[in-house]
């Protein structure tokens, strides 16, 4: 668990569910996701994001952001790879929370002997691309014109970070 002067980073817990669902509805829009994302139910959310599958940045009881992680596939030969996604509440952006979450994710990956973190980012989200690059992620692939959003074709960029043992 990491602590700064304003927030703590800890694993997600069942009581965080409503705030995490609300945060997803707030941050995943046409600039950050192929389609806005809204969970149909608490049960659906918990099936996809069980407690402990995210690291949260919290101020008191308020969730400021998260980084979610799960095995990239169910194949045993791919268990050294985590797929991740990160979200920070708009109110809490530009104060180091995303960087702290990413650092905590890298540390957790080392502890769990994960060797690679991967993520996907839309080409229409240059701020996120710059952030991931700053965090050491490399572009491994690009699915050109993968999505058609608001009358424009958008690429899906595949980025990865390799954990040093």
Predicted regions mapped to residue ranges:
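Hydrophobic pocket/interface hotspot
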Residues: 20, 24
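Conserved catalytic-core motifs of GNAT/GCN5-like acyltransferases
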Residues: 71, 118-121, 133, 138-154
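Short glycine/proline-centered loop/turn elements that form peptide/ligand docking sites
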Residues: 102, 125-128, 145-150
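Conserved GNAT acetyl-CoA-binding A-motif
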Residues: 109-120
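Conserved acetyl-CoA-binding loop-helix of GNAT-fold acetyltransferases
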Residues: 94-107, 130-134
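Glycine-rich acetyl-CoA-binding "A-motif" of GNAT/NAT acetyltransferases
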Residues: 62-65, 127, 153
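Acetyl-CoA-dependent GNAT
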Residues: 7, 14, 26-91, 102-103, ...
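Terminal substrate-recognition subdomain of acyl/acetyltransferases
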Residues: 2-3, 152-165
């Amino acid at each position: 668990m990491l602590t700064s002067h304003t927030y703590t980073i800890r694993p997600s817990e069942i009581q965080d569910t409503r705030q995490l669902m609300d945060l997803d509805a707030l941050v995943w829009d046409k600039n950050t996701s192929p389609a806005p994302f809204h969970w149909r139910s608490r049960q659906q959310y918990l099936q996809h994001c069980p407690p402990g599958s995210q690291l949260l940045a919290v101020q008191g009881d308020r969730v400021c952001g998260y980084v979610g992680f799960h095995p990239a596939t169910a194949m045993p030969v791919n268990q050294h790879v985590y797929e991740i996604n990160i979200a920070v509440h708009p109110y809490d952006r530009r104060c180091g929370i995303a960087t702290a979450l990413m650092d905590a994710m890298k540390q957790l990956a080392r502890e769990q002997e994960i060797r690679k973190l991967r993520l996907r980012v839309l080409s229409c989200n240059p701020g996120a691309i710059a952030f991931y690059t700053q965090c050491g992620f490399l572009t491994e692939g690009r699915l050109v014109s993968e999505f058609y959003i608001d009358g424009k074709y958008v690429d899906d960029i595949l980025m990865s970070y390799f954990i040093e043992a």
